[in-house]
Regions:
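Conserved internal helical-beta-strand scaffold that buttresses enzyme catalytic cores
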Residues: 2-250, 260-589
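Hydrophobic positions on the alpha1 helix immediately C-terminal to the Walker A/P-loop
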Residues: 255
Length: 589
C-alpha cells in the first residue's frame, strides 16, 4: 500500500516487537470493513443490532475495569521534565520506551496486527495531519474508520514524507496495573497498552488531536483546541462561525448541534455543526483565523442524550454507529441508556452483560460514560463546509463553565489579551443538586487541562503570540455561563435552544451592531439587547439579575485565580499577572 521508507521501517520494528500471526493493512474499503464487522460478531467482540431499526449499528462491551480515560495513567514523556509542566504527569522518555516495549513484547502472538493509516482533517487539507495506528483490536479499527478518514487515500497524500505520527496500541491483558497512555511529543509517538476503551485507544482523538497537536501547533504557529465549531446562518443566508471551549458536563455537544427557538427558525435562522469536540486553527492567507474539525465522527456520551436534549445527536446515532457500554434490549435487539426515554426495557442486559430489568433494578443499565461513535455525516445539521480543506473563518471564540453565581450569563473580553486571561481562569463547580450548596471550583483553562501536551505556562504564552500574529483579524473573545442558580438551586436561564439568543448577541457584538456596558470584568450586554421574544417563564428582570457583575464576588474570585496561577511558577506569562492585577483594581474601585 505504500513505499514510504519511514513507515515501512517502523512497521518492521513493530512486527519484531509484538510478533503478530498476520498483518492486515486497512485500505478504507467498505468490503474490508464489512468483513471485519462479521469477524468481530463471530468472536463476540461486537453484537449486530436490529438492522431495520438501527441499520449498520453494533454494540460493544469493554472490560469492567476499562471504562474511561485514565488521567493518572496518562503521561507526557518530554525530554525535559520542565517542558511537561505541573498539570501533566511526566515520565523520562528512554525509561518509558523500555517499560512500554517490555509490556508490548510478544503481545500480538495469536493475534492480527491491523495497520490504520488515518488523516486528522480532510484528506489533503493544508491543515490536516497524518498518523498510523497499529492495533490488535477490530473494535479500534472500526471506531477509527468512523472517527477519522482512513485508508489508501491517506497513504497517497503522505507519499515519501516523514511528517506523520506513530501510534502503537496493544490490548495486552487489559491489566489496569500495567495500563499506560504515553505521548512522546518530540518524537511524534503515542503508545497505549492494556486498555480497550475509546479515549485511551482511538489514538487520533485526544492523544493526537490535542496532546501531540497542541505541541506541534506551538512549534508551527497554529492552535489545537478542545473546542466545538458551529456556523450560524441568518435569514439572508450569511453564515458566521464561532468556536467554543467548555469543560466536561457543560453541554458542548448540545451547543454544537443547537436548534434555534421556533421564532428564529420561522425567520430562517439555522445552526450548522462543523465539529463538537476539537478545533485546529491557523491563520489564512487573508490574515483571519480559520478552523477545521480534525475528526470525522462524534464520540459522544450516551446517557442523557434524547429527542428533547439533543435530537440531532440522537438522529446521528440511528445508522452506522457503534455503541459502547450501553444496555442491550433483548426484546427488539436495540440499545437503551438512562435519559433516552422513560421506558426502560425489562428484558435486557446491562453494560456488563448481566441480565437487567430496567423497571425494577437499582443498578444503571448503561455505564455513566457509555458512548456512541457516529459518523458526522449522519448529523442532520452537519455543515456544508465540513470537508472544506481550508476550514471556516472564526468570528468569535467562546469560553464557558458551570458557575452557580459570580459569572454572568455572557460577557465580552476587553481585547485578545484580556480574552486569554478569561480563558485561563475558566472554571466549573460541582453543585450538590439536592442542597443547592456550591461545590468545589475546578479550574480548567481553555478546557485543556487534561489535554495540553506541554507546559501550560508556555501554552498561555502561545495564545498571546497567536494574538500578536492575528492583530486586527483576531476573533473577539467571550465567556458564557448557562448555569446560574437561584437561592433554591434552580437554574435561572432556560438554556438549550434559548442559548441561541446569546449567540445572536455575540455575533452582533462582532459586527459592531450593539453597544455594551463596561464592567470590572469586561463588556456585559444591556438586557434589552438580548431578544426574549417567545421565551417561556422568563423575564427581563431575571435577565438583568444574571447579567450583574458583583465586584465583591469577583474580588474573592481573584484570590482563587492567584492561588491557581502559583503552580505555573515563572512560566506564567507576565501579561496574565498584569490582567489579574487589573481585575483586582477594578473590583476595589
Amino acid at each position: 500500500m505504500t513505499n514510504n521508507k519511514s513507515v515501512l521501517a517502523w512497521l518492521d520494528e513493530m512486527k519484531e516487537l509484538v510478533t503478530p500471526d498476520e498483518v492486515v493493512w486497512i485500505d478504507g474499503s467498505e468490503e474490508q470493513l464489512e468483513s471485519l464487522r462479521k469477524q468481530a460478531c463471530e468472536t463476540g467482540e461486537m453484537i449486530k443490532l436490529n438492522q431495520e431499526k438501527l441499520p449498520g449499528c453494533y454494540l460493544h462491551r469493554t472490560a469492567i475495569n476499562d471504562v474511561a480515560r485514565v488521567e493518572g495513567r496518562t503521561f507526557i514523556c518530554s525530554r525535559k521534565e520542565e517542558d511537561c509542566g505541573p498539570t501533566n504527569h511526566w515520565m523520562e522518555p528512554q525509561a518509558a520506551y523500555k517499560m512500554l516495549f517490555d509490556i508490548a513484547r510478544g503481545s500480538y502472538k495469536g493475534r492480527t496486527m491491523y495497520v490504520i493509516p488515518y488523516s486528522m482533517g480532510p484528506v489533503g487539507s493544508p491543515l490536516a495531519k497524518i498518523g498510523l495506528e497499529v492495533t490488535d483490536s477490530i473494535y479500534v479499527v472500526l471506531n477509527m474508520a468512523i472517527m477519522t478518514r482512513v485508508g489508501q487515500a491517506v497513504l497517497d497524500v503522505l507519499g515519501d514524507s516523514e511528517d506523520w505520527v506513530k501510534g502503537l496500541h496493544c490490548k495486552c491483558d487489559i491489566d489496569e496495573e500495567k495500563r499506560y497512555i504515553c505521548h512522546f511529543p518530540e518524537d511524534n509517538y503515542i503508545i497505549s497498552v492494556n486498555s480497550g476503551y475509546g479515549g485511551n485507544v482511538l489514538l487520533g482523538k485526544k492523544c493526537f488531536a490535542l496532546r501531540i497537536a497542541s505541541y506541534l501547533g506551538k512549534n508551527e504557529g497554529w492552535m489545537a483546541e478542545h473546542m466545538l465549531i458551529l456556523g450560524i446562518e441568518n435569514p439572508q443566508g450569511e453564515v458566521k462561525y464561532v468556536t467554543a471551549a467548555f469543560p466536561s458536563a457543560c453541554g458542548k455537544t448540545n451547543l454544537a448541534m443547537l436548534i434555534p427557538p421556533e421564532g428564529y427558525r420561522n425567520k430562517g435562522y439555522k445552526v450548522w455543526t462543523v465539529g463538537d469536540d476539537i478545533a485546529w486553527m491557523r491563520q489564512g492567507a487573508d490574515g483571519k483565523l480559520y478552523a477545521i474539525n480534525p475528526e470525522n465522527g462524534f464520540f459522544g456520551v450516551a446517557p442523557g442524550t434524547n429527542m428533547k436534549s439533543n435530537p440531532n445527536a440522537l438522529i446521528s446515532t440511528q445508522k452506522g454507529t457503534i455503541f459502547t457500554n450501553v444496555a442491550h434490549n433483548l426484546d427488539d435487539n436495540t440499545v437503551w441508556w438512562e435519559g433516552l426515554d422513560k421506558n426502560p426495557p425489562e428484558n435486557a442486559l446491562d453494560w456488563t452483560g448481566e441480565p437487567w430489568n430496567g423497571k425494577t433494578s437499582e443498578k444503571k443499565g448503561a455505564h455513566p460514560n457509555s458512548r456512541f461513535t457516529a459518523p458526522a455525516k449522519n448529523c442532520p445539521c452537519i455543515s456544508a463546509e465540513f470537508d472544506k480543506g481550508e476550514g471556516v473563518p472564526v468570528s468569535a471564540i467562546i469560553f464557558g463553565g458551570r458557575r452557580a453565581q459570580t459569572t454572568p450569563l455572557v460577557y465580552q473580553s476587553r481585547d485578545w489579551n484580556n480574552g486569554v486571561f478569561v480563558g485561563s481562569i475558566m472554571a466549573s463547580e460541582t453543585t450538590a443538586a439536592a442542597t443547592g450548596a456550591v461545590g468545589v471550583v475546578r479550574r480548567d483553562p481553555m478546557a485543556m487541562l487534561p489535554f495540553c501536551g506541554y507546559h501550560m505556562g508556555d501554552y498561555f504564552q502561545h495564545w498571546f503570540e497567536m494574538g500578536e500574529k492575528l492583530g486586527e483579524n483576531a476573533p473577539k473573545i467571550f465567556n458564557v455561563n448557562w448555569f446560574r442558580l437561584d437561592s433554591e438551586g434552580h437554574f435561572l436561564w432556560p438554556g438549550f435552544g434559548d442559548n441561541f439568543r446569546v449567540l445572536e448577541w455575540i455575533l452582533k457584538r462582532c459586527e459592531g451592531e450593539v453597544d455594551a456596558k463596561e464592567t470590572a470584568i469586561g463588556y456585559v450586554p444591556y438586557a434589552e439587547d438580548i431578544n426574549l421574544e417567545g421565551i417561556q417563564d422568563f423575564d427581563i428582570e431575571t435577565l438583568k439579575s444574571i447579567l450583574e457583575v458583583d465586584k465583591a464576588a469577583w474580588a474573592k474570585e481573584a484570590e482563587g485565580i492567584e492561588e491557581f496561577y502559583k503552580q505555573f511558577g515563572d512560566k506564567l506569562p507576565q501579561e496574565l499577572r498584569n490582567q489579574l492585577e487589573t481585575l483586582k483594581k477594578n473590583c476595589a474601585e
